[in-house]
Design a protein with these regions (language model features):
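Feature primarily recognizes SF3-like P-loop helicase cores of small DNA viruses
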Residues: 2-43, 74, 78-489
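Trp- and S/T/G-rich repeat-edge/linker motifs of beta-rich repeat architectures
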Residues: 47, 52-66
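Active-site-surrounding "flap" and adjacent substrate/cofactor-binding loops of secreted or lumenal enzymes
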Residues: 63-77
């Protein structure tokens, strides 16, 4: 991009004058390159604010910047005063006077609403220096813009923002270095984890990874526990620290829906993920089921396509977010879906913060802690970046508690366990034909679940993990048999 402070040559100004609206637009671009952009996806003007780009609401500054073009024309008109006075040849003098008159007419036109809007309209048809698309923004996963620069997440160093980097989402706090302290925050995390330092360190690595724009871990952390356990405090504090880089999403985006929304219409929920580093889904009602297809889509690395209601075009972008689910109720997840269990990790929040602690898993609540933590914003930002640096060397490195909790969760979701308990008998002397077992399972499922029956292939995969399946003309399961009637009949 051209340096907007560079003096514009007179010949260039005169050429722009001769090209009418297209010339006005060309001169506008020369004066505003590096200061303004036109997002042609949304039709919005953007402004450079030191280290990142922001939306120019109502295009007010883009419109006001037309005065820079007016100023160039006015300076040229003033230069012509001496040239007209010095001109001896009448024809030359008349030509200069006509050019000056045209400059003043152009100035008057550009100071009208119609003239300004026309010039901005033509700007979109000129060179590409001021034209971008929505998917051009926020593509560097290792850059974290903040109030006083851009943090390099690979090193923890700060550099000045560059308009060419097209960074838009930013953290609204200053970077004060890796050593900025956050003692109350670190104690709060440790308290939430019941003094388990291994878990507190894991939370640090997890969020450290999450502030990158990478999706290499393909992970869905589920923060689970009964109410008043610090989940909301943790999330709201991170939202305060990270600003628009962390945001909530509707939990319905992750759940099975009775009616599917048309994919051809606007989908602002997906569009809201553009450029985020951390996305939080809050609370799921008891008995709800995760949508495996949605979870895989929203926690994967494949590009997403979305459009806001008033956008002119769809935007295709690669995800930059880590998605978290915060819930008091564990949603149902198919135990046989190996892909989703590779993503899902259950992180228990087992401590409750209450006014009058009476039980071993209760602690005294500090109702002012949320406001106190805001004072540690710079330190919490440093804590996040330190976690990112540790993650780069150690990976997420799941603690034993996380692996055990996730395994227990998966066992709870084993849809065949109740069927085997109610309809089968186990012993090495028993065997059952696979087709008979599936027929019995289908009847049991329809009576008890009322939803679509898992396919025979899926059922077979799960049962084959538990019982020896052999083929003798047809498949048999060895080690279990069918009861003549269910136990509760």
């Amino acid at each position: 991009m051209a340096d907007p402070a560079t003096e514009i040559p007179r010949a260039f100004v005169q050429k722009c004058l001769a090209s009418n609206e297209m010339g006005d637009a060309t001169l506008y671009i020369a004066k505003n390159a590096g200061k303004r952009l036109l997002n042609q996806t949304s039709g919005e003007w953007m402004k450079w604010v030191g280290h990142h780009w922001e939306i120019d609401k109502n295009s007010s500054e883009a419109l006001a910047a037309m005065e820079l073009v007016v100023s160039e024309y006015r300076q040229e008109a003033k230069r012509l005063v001496d040239e007209i006075s010095d001109a001896k040849d009448t024809t030359v003098k008349n030509g200069l006077m006509a050019k000056q008159k045209e400059l003043y007419r152009r100035i008057d036109r550009l100071r009208s609403v119609r003239g300004t809007n026309n010039a901005l309209t033509y700007t979109a048809r000129c060179e590409d220096r001021l034209i971008v698309n929505q998917d051009d923004f926020d593509k560097d996963p290792w850059a974290l813009p903040c109030k006083n620069g851009v943090i390099d997440l690979k090193t923890g160093q700060l550099w000045p923002g560059d308009p060419k980097d097209l960074l838009m989402k930013y953290c609204p706090h200053e970077w004060q270095g890796l050593d900025a302290p956050a003692p109350m925050w670190e104690k709060a995390i440790l308290d939430m984890m019941n003094g388990n330092q291994e878990m507190a360190d894991f939370i640090n690595r997890l969020f450290g990874y999450s502030i990158t724009g990478l999706t290499t871990e393909h992970v869905l952390p589920v923060f689970w526990g009964k109410g008043r356990n610090g989940k909301s405090l943790l999330v709201e504090t991170l939202r305060f620290v990270l600003g628009e880089m962390a945001a909530p999403i509707r939990s319905e985006m992750l759940l099975d829906q009775a009616f599917m929304k048309s994919s051809s219409g606007p989908n602002p929920d997906i569009m809201g993920l553009k450029g985020l580093r951390i996305a939080f889904a809050n609370e799921t009602d008891s008995g709800r089921h995760l949508s495996t297809s949605q979870v895989k889509q929203l926690t994967g690395a494949d590009s997403l396509v979305a459009r806001n209601p008033h956008d002119k075009y769809e935007t295709r972008f690669y995800p930059t977010h880590t998605l978290y689910l915060l819930t008091n109720n564990k949603p149902h997840v198919p135990s046989w879906d190996f892909a989703i269990w590779k993503r899902l990790i259950l992180i228990p929040f087992g401590i409750s913060f209450v006014d009058e602690p009476r039980h071993p898993d209760e602690r005294l609540i500090d109702k002012e802690l949320g406001e106190k933590l805001k004072q540690e914003a710079a330190g919490i930002l440093a804590w996040l970046v330190r976690g990112c640096l540790v993650w780069q060397f150690q990976g997420l490195n799941y603690p034993q508690l996380v692996m055990e909790s996730t395994g227990e969760y998966r066992n709870e979701e084993d849809f065949t366990a109740d069927f085997v308990d109610e309809c089968c008998i186990i012993g090495k002397e028993y065997k059952c034909r696979a087709s008979d077992l599936y027929d019995s399972f289908t009847r049991w499922w329809e009576d008890n679940q009322g939803k679509k029956v898992p396919s025979q292939k899926v059922f077979g995969k799960v049962m084959a993990q538990k019982f020896d399946r052999k083929k003798n003309m047809v498949f048999y399961y060895h080690g279990l048999g069918l009861l003549e009637t269910p136990l509760d009949a």
